[in-house]
């Protein structure tokens, strides 16, 4: 609907996490991490399936002990989304989850033991075609780097990352991605900018420990939005002290806002004033909840009066412009009907679902024609 030039993405190599491609122009993936006890298999499986339902491409699971590794085996058997095992310090856990079919190992080669143990894990990953994520965090920098720089700096995070990269380079292992996360937006952004100039591997974006649902979403939107708008980033996680499902929703909202990747409805709604002719806020809140199952990309504008309503409707898939007792409904920029203000939510839900079905069918026909 809008004619801005697409963002030019940084060129990177491609890896696969399970069957999900990352890097080299592949769609930017959205992931989250479980916050259950991994040894509670039922709770962890239920949370992973909830994340799948809202669109998670990849899910990370912490595996801190061998008991958790045994639980991971059972979890992996019950879910279809690719799983990343988050492992620190004990190389044996990495070898065990590799045996159980893990799709990616999140490790820092430098903290799982001596050179021989690193080699064992990397050789196992190579043999089983399992990629590795190097995850550098400002809160856990190596002691010598803390002493050298005095505090976490972009240069310190970069140096830490390159140490781990060098471990893999020495072992001729190229199937990896890297993250350099910090809770400070500017520190994280500059660290990623430096790293993007140093390596060709895919970058996993995140503002770590960003905060609660509201403040964390704001920090993540600013930090990830800056990087993504510069073409940096191949996969992302929004880290929130909240239900992990919210991380996926915010992640997709960031991508939708930048018109990088669309999933579901992009609601455009006015903040309301005394000119509104129907309850805009109540309508939007209700529709966001009722239509969470819609994954068809579409823009829906809900504007309470005729000041900005018609203009927004012209560039929306569906648009409502508030009017006296009845409001105008636009479809693909053309006024089609009038909706009763007293029954706005039900009428709009019905129209949106019908439009989503129409768009899905049109795409299905297009795919069939291409396949012919």
Swiss-Prot record:
- Pathway the protein contributes to: Isoprenoid biosynthesis; isopentenyl diphosphate biosynthesis via DXP pathway; isopentenyl diphosphate from 1-deoxy-D-xylulose 5-phosphate: step 5/6
**What is this enzyme's EC?**
1.17.7.3
Which SUPFAM superfamilies does the UniProt entry name for this protein?
Dihydropteroate synthetase-like (SSF51717), Nitrite and sulphite reductase 4Fe-4S domain-like (SSF56014)
GO BP: isopentenyl diphosphate biosynthetic process, methylerythritol 4-phosphate pathway; terpenoid biosynthetic process
The free-text cofactor remark is: Binds 1 [4Fe-4S] cluster.
Q: Name the cofactor(s).
A: [4Fe-4S] cluster
What one GO molecular function would you report for this record?
Answer: 4-hydroxy-3-methylbut-2-enyl-diphosphate synthase activity (flavodoxin)
The record's keywords, sorted A to Z, are:
4Fe-4S, Iron, Iron-sulfur, Isoprene biosynthesis, Metal-binding, Oxidoreductase
Reading the lineage from the top rank, the first entry is Bacteria
Q: Where does [4Fe-4S] cluster bind?
A: 270, 273, 305, 312
Listed under catalytic activity are: (2E)-4-hydroxy-3-methylbut-2-enyl diphosphate + oxidized [flavodoxin] + H2O + 2 H(+) = 2-C-methyl-D-erythritol 2,4-cyclic diphosphate + reduced [flavodoxin]
> Which PANTHER family does this UniProt record tie to the protein?
4-HYDROXY-3-METHYLBUT-2-EN-1-YL DIPHOSPHATE SYNTHASE, 4-HYDROXY-3-METHYLBUT-2-EN-1-YL DIPHOSPHATE SYNTHASE (FERREDOXIN), CHLOROPLASTIC
Could you tell me what this protein does? Converts 2C-methyl-D-erythritol 2,4-cyclodiphosphate (ME-2,4cPP) into 1-hydroxy-2-methyl-2-(E)-butenyl 4-diphosphate.
Q: Which family does it belong to?
A: Belongs to the IspG family.
What is the name of this protein? 4-hydroxy-3-methylbut-2-en-1-yl diphosphate synthase (flavodoxin)
| Protein source organism | Salmonella arizonae (strain ATCC BAA-731 / CDC346-86 / RSK2980)
The gene designation is ispG
